[in-house]
Curated annotation (Swiss-Prot):
This is Alanine racemase. Catalyzes the interconversion of L-alanine and D-alanine. May also act on other amino acids. The lineage of its organism: Bacteria, Bacillati, Bacillota, Bacilli, Lactobacillales. It catalyses: L-alanine = D-alanine. Coiled coil: none annotated.
Amino acid sequence: MVPGIHRPAVVKVNLGAIKRNIENEMQHLEPGQKMLAVVKANGYGHGAVEVAKVADQIGAAGFCVAILDEALELRRADITKTILVLGVVSPEYAPIAAANDISLTVPNLEWLKEAEKYLENSDLQLKIHLGIDSGMGRIGFNEDKDFIAANKFLENNDNFYIEGMFAHFASADSSDETYFKHQCEKFNHMKSLLTVKPKWIHVDNTAASIFHNGIKSDLVRFGIGIYGLNPSSNPNSPDLKSKIALDPALSFESELTHVKTIHQGDGVGYGSTFVADKDTIIGTVPVGYADGFIRKFQGFKVKVGNTYCPIVGRICMDQFMVEMPKEMPLGTKVVIISDNPDDLNNIKAAADYVDTIHYEVACLLNDRLPRVYYED
């Protein structure tokens, strides 16, 4: 998708906030513990390369992404530290990963056997992390016999270097620790079955690190916290108070491109879902659902100048309209999503409005919106 550099709509990312969040977490780590910065999905919409470079400078041990292409993007940007692909990569691409020093997740024994076929006639060695399904129900080993067989397969197998073993918590963002503890027990049990020694054992994500005393592990996979966002949907719960300060880094801004007065009975937008009951001032903003600002945001209040104004009518593919209490000049700044947690249109409020999580709101903002980076 072509970035709209000739349109007044941008996602602003404060690299100063990114830096502070990473530094705060690194100060919170246990002695000897390291951090993998999670920059998948284009850094949760913030920009993977730019965020990775900040984390690299501060001292992150490496990076996590979701797919092989994201890892290759970091390598092309001269990121040289460890990069782990958390998702399942087709075994046929194992040589590409190995040639680029990219670590892959092993979901099961069958994957290992297939990957070996592509590696055995080369001089390449693939770095792997053994994935454990401790209760997420997604990918990884969950049966003892299969994990034991995989360990046996890897013994004295020069095609693979066992760099890590990991799992992912399903409910570390909950104050009820019952399932969290169940997952800890399952992971520790699977760890006891190891006959090969990984370089790194890791299970803590952002939520586990800032809310709980998780498993003693070599690494913390720090994801949503990098971007200054609380992983909990209930951050005001006293049981889920973050152990570190989090500084939101993203704002989404545009401006008024058209202002007019409509009259009683006039409709706004497709289907005329808003009909004026009196003379009403309407402003148009050049952003729509094609940018990832979905139609469910109809009615959400954005900040036009210093005034919160509701979105009226259905959000269009490329534009939306707001009802304003007074006429404002063309070019007036419109903050659609604020990086100030005290503002009514912060990203958590936006997520709540459309009944989702702020992860999704940030990730929805696509490449048609240019990213502008600054440091406060």
